[in-house]
């Protein structure tokens, strides 16, 4: 099963009641390796949680979620994290998981990265919420997965246009990463 969206246009209500068009980046969801892995790549848009849930319902033997994402909408990431957490799935990052993607990654039972993977953190921002509201959601999500208040405070000092990518030693020390796999330890992204 492959779900690919190249461009999604949605009408998103804003707090003022006005509506604006919002263009969301492309994403793909694929079930791999005889149904044992689900790969998500691209932007965490509003449509992702529903499609993610459908893909998992059709592939009940999935044990690991492979993430490769620059981020996206924080609420979409929280919904994906809820699904991952409820199914007790592991998460794996072969390359990059940044911004809102880190919330989905933290939901993994085992949180595995390749030796060359990068996890990126910064303040939340996005349409429909103030910066303060977005950062409260981010803080609550990170607290849910037991990140220290010192780590969260550091993330909240990184402006939304910047990205902090702690090294693997730091990520292991604070409990974000539970395992580091050598590059190529997991099969390549092929069905």
Each language-model region and where it sits:
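Extracytoplasmic/secreted envelope proteins and their assembly/folding machinery
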Residues: 49-56, 77-81, 85, 102, ...
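STAS-typified acidic loop motif
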Residues: 18-19, 23-51
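Soluble non-cytosolic domains of exported or imported proteins
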Residues: 42-50, 71-78, 95, 99, ...
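Bacterial N-terminal signal peptides
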Residues: 1-12
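Short, glycine-/small-residue-enriched flexible loop/hinge segments at domain edges that mediate gating
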Residues: 59-76, 90-96
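Terminal peptide-recognition signature
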Residues: 40, 65, 105, 171
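Glycine-rich beta-to-alpha active-site loop
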Residues: 85, 89-126
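Charged, glycine-interspersed solvent-exposed loop segments at helix/strand-loop junctions
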Residues: 123-191
């Amino acid at each position: 099963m492959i779900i690919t969206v190249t461009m999604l246009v949605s009408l998103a209500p804003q707090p003022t009641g006005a509506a604006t068009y919002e263009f969301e980046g492309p994403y793909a969801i694929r079930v791999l390796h005889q149904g044992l892995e689900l790969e998500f790549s691209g932007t965490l848009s509003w449509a992702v949680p529903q499609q993610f849930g459908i893909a998992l319902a059709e592939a009940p033997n999935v044990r690991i979620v492979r993430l490769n994402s620059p981020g996206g909408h924080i609420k979409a990431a929280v919904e994906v994290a809820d699904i991952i957490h409820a199914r007790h799935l592991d998460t794996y990052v072969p390359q990059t998981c940044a911004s809102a993607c880190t919330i989905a990654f933290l939901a993994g039972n085992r949180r595995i990265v390749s030796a060359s993977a990068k996890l990126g953190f910064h303040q939340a921002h996005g349409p429909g919420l103030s910066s303060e509201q977005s950062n409260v959601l981010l803080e609550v999500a990170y607290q849910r997965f037991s990140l220290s208040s010192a780590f969260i405070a550091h993330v909240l000092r990184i402006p939304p246009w910047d990205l902090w990518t702690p090294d693997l030693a730091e990520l292991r020390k604070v409990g974000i990463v539970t395992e580091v796999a050598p590059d190529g330890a997991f099969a390549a992204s092929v069905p």
